[in-house]
């Protein structure tokens, strides 16, 4: 299965081609929010690459959020247009899962099976989007207890208690994690810098058996904003 993958949820813009769960080409820019300019160029380059390799696109995978409102809208509109044009399904992948996959591949964590991976995407001010055991929430970060005592994260869907204890090794990362480093003081909480979601990891997760059957109805699909988008009111005279 050949999947065209898109990741625009943060300031990093990337697109990739994955073949049978293995990334074979990726285009990425880490230097700021230029998604509207870069993404069409990346898509054109990747489609040209697939033609040269004799491949045809079987699906488009998208990092669905949460994240930057503008970035998510750019990625979603591009992905939906490609799906309509190529007549292929859209496979959405949660961005926080993509971030965890990036941490497993890029960081020195060797015991991630027994540790807690705490992905954090910036949600402005002192808020982050994070997830424990699949429960994605926007959380105001004041200290470690903001996470461990959060009512939505204390009990996971299975009914078991929260896995974070005083002795649990916790690794936190993502573009929302740096501002937490100054308020987290436990010695077993470790900040990992420079971990970002990338399109190649979207493809790896999309190829899993679970995701392959979760394509969506294109006409009604919207990105996972989590927090309601509120447009800033203009203060220019004459504009409503």
Question: In which residue ranges do the predicted regions lie?
Answer:
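Stable alpha-helical structural segments in soluble proteins, enriched in small hydrophobic residues
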Residues: 46-50, 85, 103, 199-209
């Amino acid at each position: 299965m050949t999947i065209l993958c898109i990741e625009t949820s943060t300031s990093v813009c990337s697109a990739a081609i994955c073949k049978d769960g293995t990334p074979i080409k990726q285009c990425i820019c880490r230097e700021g929010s230029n998604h509207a300019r870069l993404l069409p160029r990346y898509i054109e380059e990747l489609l040209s690459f697939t033609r040269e390799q004799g491949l045809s696109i079987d699906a488009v995978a998208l990092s669905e959020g949460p994240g930057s409102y503008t970035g998510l809208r750019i990625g979603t509109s591009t992905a939906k247009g490609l799906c309509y044009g190529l007549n292929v399904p859209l496979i959405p992948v949660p961005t926080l899962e993509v971030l965890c996959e990036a941490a497993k591949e890029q960081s020195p964590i060797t015991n991630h099976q027994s540790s807690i991976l705490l992905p954090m995407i910036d949600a402005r001010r002192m808020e982050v989007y994070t997830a424990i055991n699949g429960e994605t929430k926007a959380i105001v970060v004041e200290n470690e207890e903001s996470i461990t005592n959060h009512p939505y994260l204390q009990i996971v869907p299975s009914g078991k208690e929260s896995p974070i204890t005083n002795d649990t090794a916790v690794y936190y990362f993502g573009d929302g994690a740096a501002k937490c480093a100054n308020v987290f003081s436990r010695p077993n909480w470790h900040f990992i810098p420079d971990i970002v979601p990338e399109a190649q990891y979207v493809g790896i997760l999309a190829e899993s058996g679970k995701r392959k059957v979760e394509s969506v109805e294109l006409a009604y699909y919207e990105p996972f904003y989590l927090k309601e988008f509120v447009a800033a009111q203009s203060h220019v005279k004459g504009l409503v």
